[in-house]
Every structure is written in C-alpha cells, then in structure tokens.
C-alpha cells in the first residue's frame, strides 16, 4: 500500500511536467515567428518591419528540446495559402504592407497629419505582385497575417510621390482594427507598435516601379476618384512630411507672389513733377560787379530840369503820360500804362490791368509776357507752346543781369545802377548815356506804331531789333536744377502747384529739351526781315 502511494506521488510530477510542455507547445503555435527591422535602402533611411518566411524553429528552454513539427506545420500552413504575401529576399520590398505609426512617432505628430507608406520606386527594386489590399481580401486573411506591418519612414525626402500610387481611405483601415493583434506584449526586442487611431488622417499606398511616367488614369483618396493630370500638365506632389509640405507650400506661395509682383511692377520710373515757376522762370545775377557812382546829371529839354539818371527816367515817364492825356486819342484809352501793350477795347484793357498788374490773389498769369488766361490748364499750354525752360528774355545791358520777369530787371537797375551815367528805356531796355537821344527815343515809342514782341512785353522801333531780341533772348539760358542729370528724352510733368492728394490738378507733360530752330533757317529769316525793315525807315527819312 505504501509503494502504491509512493508511485502516485512520483507520477504526479511527471504529469504536471507533460501539461507544462503541452502548454508551451500550444504557446508556440502563433504564425508570427520573428518581426525584425531591416534596412532595405540606407540612402533613403527606410525602416521596414516585415515578415521573414525562412524562419528557424523555436528552441525550447525546457530540457533543450526542439519542438517537433513546428517548422513543417508553419510551411504547410498559411504561407502556402497566401503565396502573394510571402516576403521577397533582402534586395526586394514586400509588395503588401499596411501603414501603422510607431508609438514613438505617433506621439510626436499631430493627429491630423497624414501617414504615408510607400515602397521604393527605383528601377533596381522589383515587386512580385503589386496590389492594393481591399476590405474583402483582408477579411479572408488570418489574424496573424493581418498584423504584419511594413512601416517605412522616408528620412531623405526622395521619391516622395509617384503618379501611379494607389491609396485606401482611413475608413478601410479602421474597419479592420478589431481583427488586429498587438505584437508589443508577445515579442521581446521589437519596437512597440500601435494601431493608428480612427481620428488620425492616414494613407496607405503601394507604388509600382516607375520612372516618372504616370501609368494609371486616376487615383483614389478618401473614397473619391480623382483623375491624374496628363503628362503635359502640372506634376502632382504628395509630400510625406506635413511640416515639409507646409514649408514647401509657403515657399511656392512666396515665389508665386513675387512673380505676380514682378508682372504688375512697372520698371520705368514715374515722370518727375516740376512746378511751373521752377521750370520756366529764373534769374541770373550777371557779372556781380557794382558800377562806379558818377552822380551824372541830365537836363530835360521841355521843362529845363536837371536830374540824375533815375529821377530823370521818372520825369520822362510823366511827360509821356501827360502827352497821352492831352491828345485824348483812341489808342490812349486802349493802351496799358504799365506794360504799354495795346488792347482792342478799353474794357479788355481794364480786365488786363485788374488781373495782371493789380491782382491781389494768385491768377493764371504768364510772368514772361504778362498776359492772363482763364484757367491754369490754358496757362500751362501757353507756356509749353511759346516758352522754353529757363527762359530769361529781360536783360540788363550794363551788368548782364537776366530774369524772366520784367519788373525784376527794372528794380535791379533802379537799385544797382542808381547815380550812374546810364539811362534805361522802359520800352525796350535799351541804354543811353545822354539826355537828348534818350528823350527822342522815348517820344518815338509813344507817337509812332511800335513792334510788339509776341513772347514778352518789350516793344521795338525796328524789325531788326525785334528779330535780334527773339533770337538771342528767347532761348534757354539756364537749365532748371530739377532737369540737371536727366536724359534729354525724359518727360516732365509741369504743374502750377504741388499739393498732396490733388489728382485733378492742371498739368502738362513737356520734354526735357525742346527742339531748337535750325541756324540756317534763322539766318535766312533774319536777312529777309532785315531787308523788309529798311523800307519804312527810308520813307520816314524822306
């Protein structure tokens, strides 16, 4: 009885040992033998988690015994049923893979960033059967095979897109999450893998070998089919990294905006705006040497008064005005007492005096010829047609002082050449040194018909003097400072005043240099006019 009880005690440990062995054999049945990380292409830094078909049998740690039949059972199992999913040798890439983000990568990315899995599209790689796993085919696969994942993360950024890539939507992947098996707990030494959440935008794509030519006519994305662009159309870019995608998108936007700016931008500079007074009017100080004060006196033949040069000029002016009032002719009522210009009617004369000589406010008046105009635009057109930039027709014959305004020359002579031996004619700015010729010259200006210059207020007794005056004095004497350094073909905008925000201000565009008259034509015209001007002189002399 004691021997039997001892045998039972000895047999019970053996039975427990068999049960533990059987339990270990059952634990070794899962099809997944080894999940490894294989560097398929080191240049692109591709990480591949694949399934190795030529796996070795598991060595049992108990009694150093190899589990019998494990290798043959696996070869005869699922791998023969699904030959299309057997992984290729090391120089090939598995044709079927599902994209699953590692835990370390998924934690660093945002939930809305796309996850893309793609195989190498270089010519050196071949794929036995490239295909897209549909929901129907994935359901027929065993759970162990469905969990095999090839996760490839492109570090170099090459081959980021291929026109013939095929994609599955997120719903197709998430519908099979319940059938997947976690590999993290069962396999030591393998990085833990996590299934992509349903709210994460993920993309699965398998690329066929291509060399930049689009073979497929469309692609599927989020369940909607989009046609691929033609070979002549724009290239389709599918960036794997969302950060690089955003940076490249910003770069493309900046380049396009610069291009648009370059198209709309005018390379030519705008025409410079110059004031009318700066463009047409000016002064020249002349020699700048003061004349010697001689205190010469002059005697009037009418009233026998002896006066110095400036007072004698004023005295002669009063004699001329008194002579006009005494005659009481029509011409006296139509001639301006300031500029000695004659007008058709007394009303026009009075309007001229009010607008030009005694005007209180700014008006459209040409300072060179002392004529008033209705608007500033008419004044600008007059300046463009009749005057040149920097024109100074009024000249002091003593010191060569010049100005565009007659009043400046008269004031200059009265202040700078006072108490000298010179007398100035206020009709033509001619100089005299004695009283009798000066008085006769002034009487001729008032009694006979004079030649009015068409470009200024001066009046001449002979045509020769008028032509000489127009030829010498009505030219550009000094170029305006605003035009210095500008090319000759530059267009300049002339305005009466420059005010900010005045878009409707009167203006006119003038060339930097106006065409000058030919010297040959000027000489011919001068000679002809000189010959004609001699005829009236001969009649008067006779």
Curated annotation (Swiss-Prot):
Subcellular location: Nucleus
UniProt keyword annotations, A-Z: DNA-binding, Metal-binding, Nucleus, Repeat, Transcription, Transcription regulation, Zinc, Zinc-finger
Region (Disordered): 66-185, 499-542
Keyword Disulfide bond on entry: no
Chief localisation class: nucleus
Any GO molecular function: RNA polymerase II cis-regulatory region sequence-specific DNA binding
Pfam families membership: DUF4195 (PF13836)
Ranges of Polar residues composition bias in the record: 107-122, 499-520
Residue ranges covered by zinc fingers (C2H2-type): 334-357, 364-387, 423-445, 451-474
Function summary: May function as a transcription factor.
Protein name per the record: Zinc finger protein 280A
Originating organism: Homo sapiens
